[in-house]
Amino acid sequence: MNFKYIVAVSFLIASTYARSVKNDEQSLSQRDVLEEESLREIRGIGGALLSAGKSALKGLAKGLAEHFANGKRTAEEHEVMKRLEAVMRDLDSLDYPEEASEMETRSFNQEEIANLFTKKEKRILGPVLDLVGRALRGLLKKIG
């Protein structure tokens, strides 16, 4: 009788343990699914912000390019125009990453483009980037 009781209790403990392991696995898989969904949402928001930022930068670069395209240009303005065209190509490459290798063959990279900006351009871009940053912070506060 004691042997049957020990076997029954052992079986009960084993089945309870198996059920708890199964429940743990299910809760982990549900947690993984929820984490994956939240990561997708975060990536979606990040992608939307990135595309908005790219659009704003493209618009700014196009506006500056049009400004320098009208009328006579000095040598300095011509150099600025060439740099803006390079920046536009880099912004376009963000939309089409498969063309990034082609960009490298033309010897354009982020560090070189960053070094091309003169102090005058930094004075122009600084306040613009500050305004964009403030706008993004305002949007994030409204969203959050």
From Swiss-Prot:
Question: Which organism is this entry from?
Answer: Bombina orientalis (Oriental fire-bellied toad)
> One GO cellular component from the entry?
extracellular region
Tell me the leader sequence span.
Answer: 1-18
| Tissue specificity | Expressed by the skin glands.
Q: What is its main location?
A: secreted
Q: Which residues form a coiled coil?
A: none
GO annotation (BP), single: defense response to fungus
Full protein name? Bombinins BLP-7/GH-2
For this UniProt record, give its keywords in alphabetical order, as a comma-separated list: Amidation, Amphibian defense peptide, Antibiotic, Antimicrobial, Cleavage on pair of basic residues, Fungicide, Pharmaceutical, Secreted, Signal
Q: Which residues carry this modification: Isoleucine amide?
A: I143
Q: Of which family is this protein a member?
A: Belongs to the bombinin family.
| Residues with Asparagine amide modification | N70
Remarks, anything else? BLP-7 is also encoded by another gene from the same species (AC A0A219CM62).
Those residues forming the propeptide, per the database entry, are 19-43, 74-123
Q: Does the keyword Secreted apply?
A: yes
| Compartment annotation | Secreted
